[in-house]
Structures are given as C-alpha cells and as structure tokens.
C-alpha cells in the first residue's frame, strides 16, 4: 500500500487518460488538423482523463454523495489503492497508518474497516485534497484549448472540463 502518487498517476495515465486522449485526438486526425492542434487535443484528453479518474476514485470515499449511484467503498473492499488512500497515508500518524495497512493486507475488509478509513479521510480533509489535485489537471486541460479560436466546439470542450470533476455518479 506504500504506493507513490507518481505511480498512481502513471497507472491512470496509461488507462483512463490514454483512452480520453485517443478519443479527443481522433477528431483532429480525421479532420486533418495541424500537428499542434492534434497535440493540444491529445493533451486536453489526457488531462480530462486524469481529472475524471481522480474524481471517480474520490467519489468512492465520499459518503456525502452515496445516493448518486456509486457504492461508497467499492474500491476499498476490492483492495484498490487509489489517490484518497495514498494521500491519507501521507498525512496520518504511525498508529493510524499501521491500521490502514492492516486493512489492505487482509483479503476481506469489513464495514468497520471502511468506517474507520472514512473517518480518517474526513479528519484529514482528504476529499478536498483529491479535488485540488484534480483541479490542477482541469486547468491544464482548459489551458491547452487556448490555441483554438472561440467557437461552439471550444465552449463544449471547456464545459466538459468542469463536468469531469463536478459529476456525482
């Protein structure tokens, strides 16, 4: 469970972010856009993908929005190490860390284990920390669109940047 944030970002870059990047770049390729436009849309898609995945992983630990359809704790029960757990382990004291590590060493985690973890996430303000990280990628995505002239398409892409972080499902 001692995963670095950098390792986590590499993993989601090669999965979700790569899919988003391919999806945004293909339009530029098909329309025979300039190389710099293809690169900008590739960069945009990658950063939207990173934002989307961080938001999705954060939703798993946000008990405030469990009624939106995403089961709180799913990643936890599957033993997935995601950004909320990584950031939590950077902030907690040694006895709390020992307890969290013990949860992830087990094959089965209990509701008590999840509740304990959620309480620490709340105590250390980890949800906000995750959204700050995601916001960084939103800004990168949004800034990559600056090479394009104002248009309806650009407005749609800019709106998508906000949606990727603000979604609750």
Enumerate the predicted regions with their spans.
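All-alpha prenyltransferase/terpene-synthase fold signal
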Residues: 1-169
């Amino acid at each position: 469970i001692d995963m670095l944030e950098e390792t986590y970002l590499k993993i989601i870059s090669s999965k979700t972010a790569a899919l988003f990047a391919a999806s945004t770049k293909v339009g530029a390729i098909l329309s025979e856009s300039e190389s710099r436009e293809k690169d900008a849309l590739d960069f945009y898609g990658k950063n939207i993908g990173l934002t989307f995945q961080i938001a999705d992983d954060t939703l798993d630990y946000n008990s405030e929005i469990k009624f939106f359809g995403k089961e709180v704790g799913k990643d936890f029960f599957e033993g997935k190490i995601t950004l909320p757990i990584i950031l939590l382990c950077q902030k907690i004291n040694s006895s709390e860390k020992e307890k969290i590590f013990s949860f992830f060493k087990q094959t089965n985690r209990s509701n008590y284990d999840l509740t304990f973890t959620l309480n620490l996430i709340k105590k250390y303000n980890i949800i906000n920390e995750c959204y700050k990280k995601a916001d960084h990628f939103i800004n990168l995505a949004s800034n990559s669109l600056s090479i394009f002239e104002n248009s309806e398409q650009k407005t749609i892409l800019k709106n998508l940047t906000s949606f990727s972080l603000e979604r609750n499902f």
